[in-house]
């Protein structure tokens, strides 16, 4: 089935797997989803991810992260900001702080996908893809 919003699909799959306390979830592999997974791993929101499959059927297997004996998800919430029907852009001075810096905003810039902190440090803006906290 063709998906119009691969980022929204990725966030929904991670959110649903977290709620069901699954160890892993599979996501169709694109350059964008791969970059977002790299940012989530670097920021400590997911344990790891690996690419599987061949040709058109490639997908990412994302290992989710939990804390404590009751396995509370590290990711409390994921929110899609810029959608296919309404794109949201921000320059470096307008980049949002998520929960006062506790969470991250993932930004698509001319230098690639990065967090709001990295974009602010480099002094560049871009499309605000999503919030994670």
Curated annotation (Swiss-Prot):
Q: Which UniProt keywords apply?
A: Ribonucleoprotein, Ribosomal protein, RNA-binding, rRNA-binding
> Is Manganese set as a keyword in this record?
no
Would you say which domain of life the source belongs to?
Bacteria
Provide one Gene Ontology biological process annotation.
translation
The answer to keyword Transport applying to this record is no
Pfam families according to UniProt: Ribosomal_S8
User: Which ranges of the sequence are coiled-coil?
Assistant: none
Of the GO CC terms on this record, one is: ribosome
Xref: InterPro entries: Ribosomal_uS8 (IPR000630), Ribosomal_uS8_CS (IPR047863), Ribosomal_uS8_sf (IPR035987)
| One of the record's GO molecular function terms | structural constituent of ribosome
Q: What does this protein do?
A: One of the primary rRNA binding proteins, it binds directly to 16S rRNA central domain where it helps coordinate assembly of the platform of the 30S subunit.
Which HAMAP family has this protein been placed in? Ribosomal_uS8_B
Q: Which family does it belong to?
A: Belongs to the universal ribosomal protein uS8 family.
Q: Describe its partners and assembly state.
A: Part of the 30S ribosomal subunit. Contacts proteins S5 and S12.
What is the protein name given in its UniProt record? Small ribosomal subunit protein uS8
- What is the organism field in this record? Thermosynechococcus vestitus (strain NIES-2133 / IAM M-273 / BP-1)
Q: What's the name of its gene?
A: rpsH
